[in-house]
């Protein structure tokens, strides 16, 4: 009798531990996968070559981020993700500094679910 009870308890524990990831966890992990040193380098290169102002650079950052996201997760998940981001304002936004007219992206502003991330802390 006690073996059956222990077995049932163990099954219940396994079921609760296997719950799906929350949207916040998915957003955080996707952001870390997409925004890397290479991604920031490409944004900074665009800023220098095209001499973008901060508004244009932010737009370029978001377009590139969303294209990588769409390519990575597909259109169905992308739609859910962007609806959530629009509702809760969790899009990653860049931090720029100005070097005599040339912008450099040095990191990502904190959002509801992620802390401030500097480019030196990103994956290579």
Swiss-Prot record:
Keyword ATP-binding: no
Annotated localization: Host mitochondrion
Keyword annotations from UniProtKB, A to Z: Host mitochondrion, Host-virus interaction, Inhibition of host innate immune response by virus, Inhibition of host interferon signaling pathway by virus, Inhibition of host IRF3 by virus, Inhibition of host IRF7 by virus, Inhibition of host RIG-I by virus, Inhibition of host RLR pathway by virus, Inhibition of host STAT2 by virus, Inhibition of host TBK1 by virus, Inhibition of host TLR pathway by virus, Interferon antiviral system evasion, Modulation of host cell apoptosis by virus, Viral immunoevasion
One Pfam family named in its UniProt record: RSV_NS2
Sequence similarity: Belongs to the pneumovirus non-structural protein 2 family.
Domain topic, free-text comment: The DNLP motif has IFN suppressive functions like binding to host MAP1B.
UniProt-recorded name of the protein: Non-structural protein 2
Organism, scientific name: Human respiratory syncytial virus B (strain 18537)
């Amino acid at each position: 009798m006690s073996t059956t009870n222990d077995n049932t308890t163990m099954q219940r524990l396994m079921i609760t531990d296997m719950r799906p990831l929350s949207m916040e966890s998915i957003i955080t992990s996707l952001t870390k996968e997409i925004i890397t040193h290479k991604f920031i380098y490409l944004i900074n290169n665009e800023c220098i070559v095209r001499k973008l102002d901060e508004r244009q650079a932010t737009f370029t950052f978001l377009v590139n981020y969303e294209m990588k996201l769409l390519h990575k997760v597909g259109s169905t998940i992308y739609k859910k993700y962007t609806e959530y981001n629009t509702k809760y304002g969790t899009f990653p936004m860049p931090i720029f500094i100005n070097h005599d007219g040339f912008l450099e992206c040095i990191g990502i502003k904190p959002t509801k679910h992620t802390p401030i991330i500097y480019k030196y802390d990103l994956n290579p």
